[in-house]
Amino acid sequence: MPGKLRSASKSESEGTEESMETLQKPSEKKTRKEKPKSKTDEATEGVEEAASSKVKAVKKKGPSEDDVGPPKSKKAKKQEEEPQDDPASKSKTSKKKKEPLEKKAPSAKTKEMKAEEPSEEEADAPKPKKTKKGKEANGDVGEKSPGLKNGLSHPKPDSSSTQAPGEESETEKEIPVEQKEGAFSNFPISEETVKLLKARGVNFLFPIQAKTFHHVYSGKDLIAQARTGTGKTFSFAIPLIEKLQGGLQERKRGRAPQVLVLAPTRELANQVSKDFSDITKKLSVACFYGGTPYGGQIERMRSGIDILVGTPGRIKDHLQNGKLDLTKLKHVVLDEVDQMLDMGFADQVEEILCVAYKKDSEDNPQTLLFSATCPHWVFNVAKKYMKSTYEQVDLIGKKTQKAAITVEHLAIKCHWTERAAVIGDVIRVYSGHQGRTIIFCETKKDAQELSQNTCIKQDAQSLHGDIPQKQREITLKGFRNGNFGVLVATNVAARGLDIPEVDLVVQSCPPKDVESYIHRSGRTGRAGRTGVCICFYQHKEEYQLAQVEQKAGIKFKRIGVPSATEIIKASSKDAIRLLDSVPPTAIGHFKQSAEKLIEEKGAVEALAAALAHISGATSVDQRSLINSQAGFVTMILRCSVEMPNISYAWKELKEQLGESIDAKVKGMVFLKGKLGVCFDVRTEAVTEIKEKWHDSRRWQLTVATEQPELEGPPEGYRGGRGQRDGSRGSFRGQRGGSRNFRGQGQRGGSRNFRGQRPGGGNKSNRSPNKGQKRSFSKAFGQ
């Protein structure tokens, strides 16, 4: 086809020149056809009426051009064939029409067509056809402002009108599919609600909201699963509010709630309640949870409630006291359903819901279950409350990654004794003084201690179950408002909390279950923003980290601790930002001192010292990139060929640096592909090693600036060095065995591997029935 079209257009262009003289003679018809052209020329000056006459002229021209045959039958054929030409609205159709025409060819029609086009603007054959079809496709919509939209003021009307449909399609392409599907006009949402949503910064429904709206609005039971930070709260809040406001009757005092939303934590309940209140002014929204006085809540029930949000404990208390009536419920929402129906909450939830639910009754309230994680057991438990015809919306499905895709997942290997100091450095580099960070700890004690640790230079406060409810609310409000930059919390803050602009999430150790990791990491990278989640782990916790990777469908990028250079660079940027916040009135008081400093130290030295002090980076410890230990520097020894064993590197080090290097090197491990090794040396030994070492064609020694990819786990500290003929260090096996393998020695070989010690068992053996028992807190440094 393309070949035919090209050859056809070639022959047509040749035929055009030959037929020019013949086409100039006929007649009154030709004269009549050229009259609209003069009108078209006038239309190029911006007159809209001329534009519409041009559209008509083109339409008239189309059929007359397409009619092939003697002049006498032309009118009749024009009337018969006119409807067939009109529907043509695509360029493909125009190309298809040319083939048969050219087979019939050198008729008057083809010549006439070709003669007219060059006279207008020497364009290719398809151009006028595209113009006509583009205008026909626009229809009545284009009539509103054809002169302006289609650019008729341009001297080439055909080309400009040809661009109009293209311009429209480009505009359509610019609008993401999500925005098209989530446009408010697609849903029965009142103008009042739309205004309130826009005031909250919501200009269209997010995917989970768009896909669940009609299910919720039509009264169907629903299980919905979507990643954290995708707007699940509004997924049920918007349709329920529209439904209740649509059937709003007289608001009687003391009326019972029609909607009950249960949340696992007080903080989440408070937030859900606020989300409801922000998008309705007609309905009464109340939030009941523990740690607050009963009196105010009882008064709210006397006034009447339309939507009740709360935690299971306090709702159950009001039921038992006979103060709360749930018999009029029409809608029940379980937010974060996996935790809600967990062992600790299942009994309370069942006791609450049995008041409003009857066994196998179609009159039971609509039940909505929402969460980012839905284990299989959730579906089994949910069937007790849901109708058999329930709907399911899953925006995660079989996708391997369950965690938020807007979050970068990093992991740092660090002993618990160094953890607080390294976390302080991490916050400096990844968040800074102006950013917001949430640190998650496993215990209340850890959260309290870490928030008060001097290694964290930013203002930090803790949030956990032992803090009074009123103080918890003040703390969360302060963090939201940016009054302080670091929040150290237990799982209290892991679920559902929508805190804007959290730059960094730090997990002090891998959580016990993958769901916790997903929810914790989801506190950053929300509502389209990107974020970073850094998980700290010890050698003992590598298995737990691997489990998180496997079940959450993510891959941690193993990184080293921030280097001294990175810390200083980040700290200086922070200090410069802080200078911008100093008011001009305050600067005047320090000018005299500044001038004196400049005279004594010089401008650059004085300012550099001031920046160092402001940033708090007056002293920065070098740390190992392998295990984060302070006072060590990681070095890389690269080899141009694959190394058969690690002794190959030891031999080269000793040849150049002497036997004494044996005592200075720690934790040697292969690089990826065995094309070198990396190891730690004391900070004070680095200069001496650099002076003695000379690179060769095969060997190059450098100081590592970032953690390299490793072949496997590093050798045990203090067990990674020794002579090539036997194992040395604290994990001493029999001297006759190889350092790298598993020789059975007097104490059972290296405890890094598979040897059994007489009284204990292998340290790395994870079987609970073998070896000496160790306390959990000692093992994990808690």
UniProtKB/Swiss-Prot annotation:
Q: Where is the Helicase ATP-binding domain?
A: 213-392
One of the GO BP terms on file: transcription by RNA polymerase II
Q: Where is this motif: Q motif?
A: 182-210
A GO CC annotation given for this chain: B-WICH complex
sequence repeats at which positions? 720-724, 731-735, 741-747
Q: Which residues bind ATP?
A: A226, R227, T228, G229, T230, G231, K232, T233
What the entry lists under InterPro entries is as follows: DEAD/DEAH_box_helicase_dom, DEAD_box_RNA_helicases, GUCT, Helicase_ATP-bd, Helicase_C-like, P-loop_NTPase, RBD_domain_sf
Where in this protein would one find the motif DEAD box, according to its record?
335-338
How the protein assembles, per its UniProt entry?
Answer: Homodimer; homodimerizes via its N-terminus. Found in a multi-helicase-TICAM1 complex at least composed of DHX36, DDX1, DDX21 and TICAM1; this complex exists in resting cells with or without poly(I:C) RNA ligand stimulation. Interacts (via C-terminus) with TICAM1 (via TIR domain). Interacts with DHX36 (via C-terminus); this interaction serves as bridges to TICAM1. Interacts (via C-terminus) with DDX1 (via B30.2/SPRY domain); this interaction serves as bridges to TICAM1.
What is known about what this protein does? RNA helicase that acts as a sensor of the transcriptional status of both RNA polymerase (Pol) I and II: promotes ribosomal RNA (rRNA) processing and transcription from polymerase II (Pol II). Binds various RNAs, such as rRNAs, snoRNAs, 7SK and, at lower extent, mRNAs. In the nucleolus, localizes to rDNA locus, where it directly binds rRNAs and snoRNAs, and promotes rRNA transcription, processing and modification. Required for rRNA 2'-O-methylation, possibly by promoting the recruitment of late-acting snoRNAs SNORD56 and SNORD58 with pre-ribosomal complexes.
Report what the protein is called.
Nucleolar RNA helicase 2
Protein species of origin = Rattus norvegicus (Rat)
What does the record give as the organism's lineage? Eukaryota, Metazoa, Chordata, Craniata, Vertebrata
